[in-house]
Amino acid sequence: MVDRKEIPLAMGLLAVLLFFVASSSSFHLVRASDEVDDAIFYESFDEDFDNRWIVSGKEEYNGVWKHSKSEGHDDFGLLVSEPARKYAIVKELDAPVSLKDGTVVLQFETRLQNGLECGGAYIKYLQTQESGWKPKGFDNESGYSIMFGPDRCGATNKVHFIFRHKNPKTGKHVEHHLKFPPSVPSDKLSHVYTAVLKDDNEVSILIDGEEKKKANFLSSEDFEPALIPSKTIPDPDDKKPEDWDERAKIPDPEAVKPEDWDEDAPREIIDEEAEKPEPWLDHEPEVDDPEAKPEDWDDEEDGEWEAPKIENPKCEAAPGCGEWKRPTKSNPAYKGKWSAPYIDNPNYKGIWKPQEIPNPEYFELEKPDFEPIAAIGIEIWTMQDGILFDNVLIAKDDKIAESYRETTWKPKFNIEKEKQKHEEEAAAAAAARSESEGIAGIQKKAFDLLYKIADIAFLSGQKEKIIEIIEKGEKQPNLTIGIIVSVVIVFVSIFFRLIFGGKKPANVEANVEKKKTNTETTSKQDGGEKEDNKEKEETANPPRRRPKRDN
């Protein structure tokens, strides 16, 4: 029996255990909640985008956005539904996001479900627009701080990273393009693009979590044009002096043409030592082409026919035809037009260039003065439909972005990758099967032809051998070519034997057959003479024997 004194102790232990479990669960839930709260902005598109994302009202943007599932998944995204259209849609943030302090991570997924031959799949992170701007007015002229994402058309194949920066001296915004950006993946799988903007002026571009490019905002080697302008510029008002001599070399003014310099001597002269080759056919010029005249040529309507000339057939074996002329050769006395040699120009001043002046647009800074992100927009033109945007994220920590990649993108990608692998294996198997069936069909036709060859009358003596070879080939298809060659050799051998060496044996066989018939007839008349005739026949036609070799 259970001791009643132990019941309170057991209940206490159970309560402690339940509290521990509850505390652990609460801890994990809080951690997950904290992780979500760390995202400045996140759009999963699990719910319809209507009334949250605003489609541009501009007439040129006639592409239809749809809330659609990614192919093969239950996960929804924002879909480009029609090809050869312009698209524009925007989502205003609850509060502007500063890009100046600390790390900022921009991340989103795209899936090019029908590929991308010519079009964009990038996102624009818009700056605060002018007063009175409405999301319905979003277009290509709407200012952005950063443009990031895939773009492909013709020779262009890159993941854009462009930032717009306001010049503090001029007030103008300048686009600065990342040099040598990474390429866009060429498959139709989901891919996640991440840009990590760090406080040390570095930016890292990741594709599927793997760093593909690192750059520095202040480096002229990483961005074109450079963020910080040059200190000086060529003076636009400076002009080259009229007496500025840029010629490094000039003709020697004191040089004199030699007296024996013959400018009129020709480059080539007739070779007087040449002799006419024998047998040169002097009286065999080109002849009319007898086959050139069209059959429907009518002299009355089309005029008198003038046949084109062709080479005289008699000239094929001769060194030449027609009138022979001596060839020309290089003239050893040829010098050409005389010109004075060049000397260093004593007045040479070098290649002129305008003088440098202070650049009025020059400024210095330690960090880019990014304008905050006030909205997220997609403004693209594409020839392909099926582009799906999903899981748009802005965060202050790249660990948050990594967590989202692991939980939202990677499971989908793994499924798609496995499916792609199976499809490629199936396609390879189908191609191999098709190739095998094609080869099998060719082999069947080849063997059918070989059987027909075996039935040719003059091959009757070799028919069994040929059939045996063919049947062996049918059992071992990889020997088909060898079998064909073997049969062709047999065929050609017998054919040549028949054409070039078969007449005499045929006559001998006819004579033997004739004598055999006569012998049989005579044997009926006189049985005693049968053996005598046989001996005479053997004496007259002794069999050919191979000489024996001494071992």
Curated annotation (Swiss-Prot):
It is found in: Endoplasmic reticulum membrane. Residues 1-26 form the signal peptide. Residues 226-330, 510-551 are annotated as: Disordered. Residues 502-551 are cytoplasmic. It is a single-pass type I membrane protein. The keyword Methyltransferase does not apply. Keywords: Calcium, Chaperone, Disulfide bond, Endoplasmic reticulum, Glycoprotein, Lectin, Membrane, Metal-binding, Repeat, Signal, Transmembrane, Transmembrane helix. One of its GO terms (biological process) is ERAD pathway. InterPro entries: Calret/calnex, Calret/calnex_CS, Calreticulin/calnexin_P_dom_sf, ConA-like_dom_sf. Residues 233-364 are annotated as: P domain (Extended arm). In vegetative and flowering tissues. GO terms for molecular function: calcium ion binding; carbohydrate binding; unfolded protein binding. Sequence repeats lie at residues 235-246, 252-263, 271-282, 289-299, 303-313, 322-332, 336-346, 350-360. The keyword Signal applies. Residues 27-480 are lumenal. Residues 234-269, 276-295, 526-539 have a biased composition (Basic and acidic residues). Disulfide bonds join C118-C153, C315-C321. An alpha-D-glucoside binds at Y122, K124, Y144, D151, E379. Calcium-binding protein that interacts with newly synthesized monoglucosylated glycoproteins in the endoplasmic reticulum. It may act in assisting protein assembly and/or in the retention within the ER of unassembled protein subunits. It seems to play a major role in the quality control apparatus of the ER by the retention of incorrectly folded proteins. This is Calnexin homolog. It comes from Pisum sativum.
